[in-house]
Regions:
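Acidic-and-aromatic substrate-binding clefts and catalytic sites of carbohydrate-active enzymes
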Residues: 61-63, 88-90, 226-227
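Divalent-metal coordination cores built from histidine and acidic residues
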Residues: 69-174
Length: 242
C-alpha cells in the first residue's frame, strides 16, 4: 500500500493551464507535488486536479459532512463551498460549528460561510434567528470564509438596513459576499453588484449573466439535480473564459 505522503502516479496528465494532455509521472513527497516528469508510461488513466463544487448545501444530501466527503471524493470532488443555512435555521451557530468540526474529521476541504438568511424569510418559524452579534461572531471565525448567499435580493437592491449591515460586517472582516439573485438584470443587477456582491449561481438567461458580469460579478453556471442552466449559459465560456 502506498504511503499517503510519499508516492508517484503515472498516466495521462491533464494540464489545465496549457490546455494539453501528456504522458508522464507525478511525484508526491510529504504530501506535496514535488515534480512532474514527461515520459512514456504504460498506465493509460488520466490525472488531473480535484474538482471544487462552488455551491452546495451539504445538508440537502441528508448526510453529515464527513460521510458526504466519502461519497463525493470517489467522483473527483475534493472540496466544496458550502452555505450551512439549513442547519443554521434549526440549530443556529451551534449547527454551523458542528458542520465545521465534523468536516475536520476527513481529509476533504469544506469552505463554510456565514449564513445570511436565518430565518430564510420573515414569514416562517425557524429554530433560530441571527442578529448582529451572531453575524459578528461567525464572520470573525477563521473557519468561516465568506458571507453566504444574499438571498433577500430585493432587500439588497432597496438598501434594507439589516441586509446592508450584514454586508458591512463581512467587509469589516475582509470576507467576500456570495450572491443569490435570480432573474435580475439592468439597473437592479447594477444595484445588487454595487452593494458588494461578488458572485451569483442563480442565472437563467444570457442577458442576466452578461449584465451581472458587466457590473463585476462572477457567474457560476449551475447544472444541478434540480435547476439546470448549462445549456442556456455555456456560450459564456467563449468570451469569458475566466
Amino acid at each position: 500500500m502506498k504511503s499517503r505522503q510519499n508516492f508517484s502516479l503515472s498516466g495521462n496528465i491533464v494540464d489545465l493551464i496549457a490546455n494539453s494532455i501528456f504522458k508522464g509521472t507525478v511525484y508526491i513527497e510529504d504530501g506535496i507535488i514535488r515534480k512532474i516528469v514527461k515520459q512514456e508510461v504504460k498506465e493509460d488513466h488520466y490525472i488531473l486536479p480535484g474538482l471544487i463544487d462552488s455551491h452546495i448545501h451539504i445538508e440537502s444530501s441528508m448526510l453529515i459532512p464527513s460521510e458526504f466527503a466519502k461519497l463525493a471524493v470517489v467522483h473527483g470532488t475534493v472540496a466544496t463551498v458550502s452555505d450551512p443555512h439549513e442547519i443554521a435555521n434549526v440549530l443556529g451557530i451551534d449547527g454551523i460549528k458542528y458542520m465545521i468540526s465534523n468536516g475536520n474529521k476527513v481529509p476533504f476541504k469544506f469552505y463554510f460561510g456565514a449564513s445570511a438568511c436565518v430565518p430564510a424569510t420573515p414569514f416562517e418559524t425557524s429554530g433560530f434567528q441571527f442578529h448582529e452579534a451572531e453575524m459578528e461572531e461567525l464572520l470573525g471565525m477563521k473557519e468561516i470564509k465568506y458571507l453566504s448567499e444574499m438571498m433577500n435580493f430585493p432587500g439588497v437592491i432597496n438598501r434594507d438596513p439589516w441586509e446592508m449591515k450584514k454586508i458591512e460586517i463581512a467587509r469589516n472582516h475582509n470576507k467576500p459576499i456570495d450572491g443569490h439573485a435570480p432573474g435580475i438584470t439592468s439597473d437592479d443587477a447594477r444595484k445588487y453588484a454595487e452593494a458588494g456582491i461578488t458572485t451569483d449561481h442563480e442565472c437563467f438567461s444570457m442577458k442576466e449573466a452578461l449584465d451581472k458580469i458587466e457590473y463585476g460579478m462572477k457567474i457560476q453556471i449551475r447544472e444541478g439535480s434540480a435547476a439546470k442552466n448549462f445549456d442556456a449559459l455555456i456560450d459564456l465560456m467563449q468570451e469569458h473564459e475566466d
